[in-house]
């Protein structure tokens, strides 16, 4: 089974967590694209979706899935999204696709976070994948200096502007043993919008595509 086939299996397995007549929170990325394809098969049974990125919004609209603005929605029963890394405590690094802030907002509104990944994303310690930090453009150099003090090697992601008009610093060479504390510490730096650690709001259910099929993990 190829990596993409494992992503597809995880994406389709997430349909089980979609409630009839609900509005579904939808994330961003290659695995989520498979979930969107799956969601389109039951679009008549749901009210619609809230999206965490312009890319996912475009794909859902093209497939005829109604997309709502989050400000018009009081509650989401489920949020389905991928991860760049996830550990055994269901803490994640996300934001490889630069949609981390909107992903974090939609995840905060949802009752349940279902994370869909292939088996290459499971790790014991977070940090092998560089940690994305969304930054107000004028604060880029200051924030980079502060991240160095925390032990990281920040690199400006050139040519990338987030959907919110900000820039991304990718922080390399961090072994993250206390994700919750580091998430809060980085978010306290003036000029940081948010960072790609999803630890204070981790996943509730993990669906992992493996060569043997989809593995379900709950904390």
UniProtKB/Swiss-Prot annotation:
GO terms for molecular function: ribose-5-phosphate isomerase activity. It is an enzyme of class 5 (isomerase). Pfam families: Rib_5-P_isom_A. Keywords: Isomerase. Gene3D superfamilies: 3.30.70.260, 3.40.50.1360. Pathway: Carbohydrate degradation; pentose phosphate pathway; D-ribose 5-phosphate from D-ribulose 5-phosphate (non-oxidative stage): step 1/1. GO terms for biological process: D-ribose metabolic process; pentose-phosphate shunt, non-oxidative branch. Transmembrane segments: none annotated. The keyword Nucleotide-binding does not apply. It comes from the Bacteria. Belongs to the ribose 5-phosphate isomerase family. Homodimer. This is Ribose-5-phosphate isomerase A. It comes from Shewanella loihica (strain ATCC BAA-1088 / PV-4). The gene is rpiA.
